[in-house]
Amino acid sequence: MSCSSALDCFIKNYLKSYQDTLSEFPRYYPLGEDSICIQGTFNADTDDTVFWQPVKRDNVADFSNVEHALNIQLHQDIHAFYGQYFSAPLPFTASFGDGELLQAWNQDDFENLQQNVIGHLIMKKKLKQPATWFIGVLGEGDEMLTVNNDDGSVWIEIPGEKQRTKLAESLTEFLESLSPMIKPPSKPVEELPHTVDHPGIWQRIKTMWDYLLRKK
């Protein structure tokens, strides 16, 4: 099975789990950010939750601009994982713990994602560490899930350190090991003087990298 098909299967199971258990779509705090994923009406002036579901793009987006900017060839799975859908973060449970998969909520979020991938790759180069790119977080967000760009394997990584625990030989194998997690939506907490410019999982990753940069 390809990474693309494995992601399709996980998302299908994710939606089915919500319908079977709650008879509704998942809920999410969009924080004023519109998305084709939203089911029903959307009011940008409120901070209420919305019902949503992942929406497959008409054309798969890619990271060719990132490759050009950094003169690097990214593992092909990055295009399949991030370029197929618009979606909120996808909570999961697995033998190694609970976490969330990162996805782009809308096109602006996808472009922010590309910039964050660039920042991550630059930081890895600065630290003289092998290139990786993140796909999500574990637990409370102090550990990242990252893909080794050389061979496509999936690992646990702490910001500023090398990948430390291998979880799967490929992103396909990793996705096949996950089970959807049904959980109430978590509203990101704004901590002054910072502002929350990315909902949910984005704020976690941003906080991790802010912490790393303060240490360096």
Curated annotation (Swiss-Prot):
The keyword Cell membrane applies. GO terms for cellular component: cytoplasmic side of plasma membrane. Its main location: membrane. Pfam families: Syd. It is found in: Cell inner membrane. It is a peripheral membrane protein. The keyword Cell inner membrane applies. HAMAP family: Syd. Belongs to the Syd family. Interacts with the SecY protein in vivo. May bind preferentially to an uncomplexed state of SecY, thus functioning either as a chelating agent for excess SecY in the cell or as a regulatory factor that negatively controls the translocase function. This is Protein Syd. It comes from Shewanella frigidimarina (strain NCIMB 400). The lineage of its organism: Bacteria, Pseudomonadati, Pseudomonadota, Gammaproteobacteria, Alteromonadales.
